[in-house]
Each structure stands twice: as structure tokens, then as C-alpha cells.
Amino acid sequence: MSRIGKKPVAIPTGVTANIADGVLSVKGPKGELSMPLSSEVTYSLEDGQLSVQPVNDTKRARSFWGMQRTLVQNLIDGVTQGYSKTLQITGVGYRAASQGKTLKLQLGYSHDIDFAIPEGITIQTPEPTTVNISGIDKQKVGQVAAEIRRWRRPEPYKGKGIKYAGEFIFRKEGKKK
């Protein structure tokens, strides 16, 4: 039995959830999100709570149970609070600047990198070495952060590169003479 899946998802005031044609739509103060529903589980919306139950007792249905409940919770959290990730840039001459719909990155290459900011994502650079990514879709925020980080992953000798805020970079000792 799924410990996560058996808990119903509370729908706070100011948020409306609607199930129609195999799609769950959630509308809140920050915006609107929707996701296709899985046929492995059933969804019931009653008394300001959305509960998820597996269709049958197969391993596949049970594994989808907790995941689908978590995805529904992520939708509701996104339209009420939103999600954000912070990236830190370390290295001499490494910097970032937000210019309209693009993020300009200088990461030690012979050219600057212009990253197009996707729809529904806001990127702020309070400092040249800090990038704040925010939005209502948890998956999209994480994907954008991973794409930016991929341009220059932190290296283990000096720690230069782009890392998530709070991420531990395993450091190696250099060659001994």
C-alpha cells in the first residue's frame, strides 16, 4: 500500500480543480496548469479534496498510484506558491545577465551563450554570479535549471562552473610533485 498515494490532496481556497476528458486542470492565484490523467488510477474530487486510487492491484497500478498523487500535489503547489531554483556561478570571468527574453552567459568559451527563456519561466540575475529561476511548473523550472547548468558543470579541482545553491561539489586534490 502506498503511503504517499493513500493521502488525499487538499485543495486550498482560491484554487479550483476540474477533471474532464482525461485531463486535470488546476487554476489558482499564480496561473493555470493541466496534466493528462493516467488510466492506471482513478481520481475522485469531493469535499475540497482530490483522492487517487489504483484501478487494480497490479504492480504497475500501484507504482503509478503514489506518483500520480505527487504530480497532482505539485500542480496545486505550483499555482498557489510557485517553484524556484537558484544557480551559483563560480569562476574568474564567469557571469550571467538577463536581457529581456534571453539569458546571456559568459562561461569562459570564445563566445557568449544566449539562452532563450521559455514561456512561463522568469529568470532574474540579482548578481552577475547568481541566477534565480522561477515559475509555476516544477518540471519546467528544474529542466531549465538543468539546461543552464549543463553549459558548464562544476569541476572537482577548483570548483569552477555552474552549481545549484546548496549543492556540494566533491573536491579532488591536484597532482603532487
UniProtKB/Swiss-Prot annotation:
<keyword id="KW-0687">Ribonucleoprotein</keyword>
<keyword id="KW-0689">Ribosomal protein</keyword>
<comment type="similarity">
    <text>Belongs to the universal ribosomal protein uL6 family.</text>
</comment>
<dbReference type="GO" id="GO:0002181">
    <property type="term" value="P:cytoplasmic translation"/>
</dbReference>
<comment type="subunit">
    <text>Part of the 50S ribosomal subunit.</text>
</comment>
<dbReference type="GO" id="GO:0019843">
    <property type="term" value="F:rRNA binding"/>
</dbReference>
<dbReference type="InterPro" id="IPR036789">
    <property type="entry name" value="Ribosomal_uL6-like_a/b-dom_sf"/>
</dbReference>
<dbReference type="GO" id="GO:0003735">
    <property type="term" value="F:structural constituent of ribosome"/>
</dbReference>
<protein>
    <recommendedName>
        <fullName>Large ribosomal subunit protein uL6</fullName>
    </recommendedName>
</protein>
<dbReference type="InterPro" id="IPR019906">
    <property type="entry name" value="Ribosomal_uL6_bac-type"/>
</dbReference>
<keyword id="KW-0699">rRNA-binding</keyword>
<dbReference type="InterPro" id="IPR020040">
    <property type="entry name" value="Ribosomal_uL6_a/b-dom"/>
</dbReference>
<dbReference type="InterPro" id="IPR002358">
    <property type="entry name" value="Ribosomal_uL6_CS"/>
</dbReference>
<dbReference type="InterPro" id="IPR000702">
    <property type="entry name" value="Ribosomal_uL6-like"/>
</dbReference>
<dbReference type="Pfam" id="PF00347">
    <property type="entry name" value="Ribosomal_L6"/>
</dbReference>
<dbReference type="GO" id="GO:0022625">
    <property type="term" value="C:cytosolic large ribosomal subunit"/>
</dbReference>
<comment type="function">
    <text>This protein binds to the 23S rRNA, and is important in its secondary structure. It is located near the subunit interface in the base of the L7/L12 stalk, and near the tRNA binding site of the peptidyltransferase center.</text>
</comment>
<keyword id="KW-0694">RNA-binding</keyword>
